[in-house]
């Protein structure tokens, strides 16, 4: 086990490039990599006909030119949508990527990836076999993946289907009963919003051999506080937070 005091800080960029490109798109991954991002957080769903794809929201309206529930559509419809609709820096239409497209890119990219499983228990029956197959077909990409979910069912099932992969449980507050449950599931990390991590809670997580992951890190001051209390994985929407932190420490 790596001692918490010596483990390097991990900066995980949400959506691939934060606010610099349409989230969960190939454009975001390419932009993030070009800016030196080495760890990203993307969101995984499954289409009505069983194709895993990258998309965050349940509904399509916020980021596409369509309306409706994303996972209720077949892949032939989803892949035609513009996933950059309304984004302030989008240079042109961006398609919703299939998981296989992302993993094919990841095979040669020097970057790690957390995939958040955004699926109901019923949808897991479609998603997990397709996910496992894609990982088997592209092992160089698979070794760079870990998985997260706020669903205990999804976390447990991922452990059964994708053996040996890192897993993270998303929680509201990292209280001891939750930490114990996470440890019993065999996950390596628990994640919650930045405001819910205190030094005591980080210490409690370590007692259960769990890494603390913080979401909604809004600025450099947030980052400094979290690092001071012992959080080693920070999830950010703004890549410049890391740059400002690095500058302040040099």
Question: Where are each of the predicted segments found?
Answer:
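Phosphate-group recognition and catalysis centered on beta-loop-alpha active-site segments
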Residues: 1-250
């Amino acid at each position: 086990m790596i001692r918490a005091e010596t483990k390097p800080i991990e900066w995980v960029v949400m959506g691939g490039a934060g606010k610099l490109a349409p989230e969960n798109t190939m454009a975001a991954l390419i932009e993030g990599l070009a800016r030196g991002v080495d760890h990203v957080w993307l969101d995984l769903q499954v289409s009505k006909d069983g194709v895993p794809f990258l998309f965050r929201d349940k509904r399509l309206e916020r980021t596409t030119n369509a309306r409706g529930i994303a996972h209720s559509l077949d892949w032939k419809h989803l892949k035609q949508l513009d996933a950059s609709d309304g984004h302030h820096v989008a240079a042109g239409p961006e398609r919703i990527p299939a998981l296989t497209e992302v993993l094919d890119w990841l095979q040669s990219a020097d970057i790690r990836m957390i995939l958040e499983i955004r699926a109901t228990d019923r949808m897991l029956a479609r998603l997990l076999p397709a996910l496992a197959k894609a990982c088997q077909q592209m092992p160089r990409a698979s070794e760079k993946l870990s998985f997260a979910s706020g669903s205990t069912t999804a976390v447990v099932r991922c452990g059964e289907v994708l053996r040996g992969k890192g897993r993270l449980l998303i929680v509201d507050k990292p209280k001891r009963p939750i930490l114990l449950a996470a440890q019993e599931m065999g996950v390596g990390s628990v994640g919650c919003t930045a405001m819910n991590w205190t030094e005591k809670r980080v210490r409690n997580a370590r007692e259960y051999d769990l890494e603390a992951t913080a979401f909604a890190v809004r600025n450099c001051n947030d980052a400094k506080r979290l690092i001071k209390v012992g959080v080693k994985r920070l999830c950010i929407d703004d890549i410049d937070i890391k740059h400002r932190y690095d500058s302040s420490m040099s």
